[in-house]
Amino acid sequence: MSHSVKIYDTCIGCTQCVRACPTDVLEMIPWDGCKAKQIASAPRTEDCVGCKRCESACPTDFLSVRVYLGAETTRSMGLAY
C-alpha cells in the first residue's frame, strides 16, 4: 500500500524524521528556505507503511502522512497545520 507523505515549509532541518523512519522513505535535501539549509523530502513514498514515526519524531509538526485505501475514503493520519 502506498502512502502520500506531504512535506511543508516549517521544517527546521533536524533530521529526526529521517532517523525515525523504519522504511527509509525520507531523506534530507538542500533547501535555502530554513536556517539549517536542508529540508525533509520523501522520494520513496511507495515504501511508506503509515506508521507515523516520522510525525511523532518531528518537533514542529511538519509532516503529514495520508493513507489512501483504494476506493475507501482518504483518512488523514497527519497533524493539523
Curated annotation (Swiss-Prot):
Subcellular location: Plastid thylakoid membrane
Keywords on record: 4Fe-4S, Electron transport, Iron, Iron-sulfur, Membrane, Metal-binding, Oxidoreductase, Photosynthesis, Photosystem I, Plastid, Repeat, Thylakoid, Transport
Keyword presence, Transferase: no
Record carries keyword Transmembrane helix: no
4Fe-4S ferredoxin-type domain mapped to chain residues: 2-31, 39-68
Pfam family membership, one: Fer4_21
Catalytic activity of the protein: reduced [plastocyanin] + hnu + oxidized [2Fe-2S]-[ferredoxin] = oxidized [plastocyanin] + reduced [2Fe-2S]-[ferredoxin]
Cofactor dependence: [4Fe-4S] cluster
Enzyme class: oxidoreductase
Binding site for [4Fe-4S] cluster 1: 11, 14, 17, 58
InterPro entries named among the record's database cross-references: 4Fe4S_Fe-S-bd, 4Fe4S_Fe_S_CS, PSI_iron-sulfur_center, PSI_PsaC
Note describing how the cofactor binds: Binds 2 [4Fe-4S] clusters. Cluster 2 is most probably the spectroscopically characterized electron acceptor FA and cluster 1 is most probably FB.
EC numbers: 1.97.1.12
SUPFAM superfamilies for this protein: 4Fe-4S ferredoxins
Residues reported to bind [4Fe-4S] cluster 2: 21, 48, 51, 54
GO biological process: photosynthetic electron transport in photosystem I
Gene Ontology molecular functions: 4 iron, 4 sulfur cluster binding; electron transfer activity; metal ion binding; oxidoreductase activity
Membrane topology: Peripheral membrane protein
GO CC annotation terms, alphabetical: chloroplast thylakoid; photosystem I; plastid thylakoid membrane
Superkingdom, taxonomy of origin: Eukaryota
Function: Apoprotein for the two 4Fe-4S centers FA and FB of photosystem I (PSI); essential for photochemical activity. FB is the terminal electron acceptor of PSI, donating electrons to ferredoxin. The C-terminus interacts with PsaA/B/D and helps assemble the protein into the PSI complex. Required for binding of PsaD and PsaE to PSI. PSI is a plastocyanin-ferredoxin oxidoreductase, converting photonic excitation into a charge separation, which transfers an electron from the donor P700 chlorophyll pair to the spectroscopically characterized acceptors A0, A1, FX, FA and FB in turn.
Subunit note: The eukaryotic PSI reaction center is composed of at least 11 subunits.
HAMAP family in the cross-refs: PSI_PsaC
Descriptive protein name: Photosystem I iron-sulfur center
Organism: Cuscuta gronovii
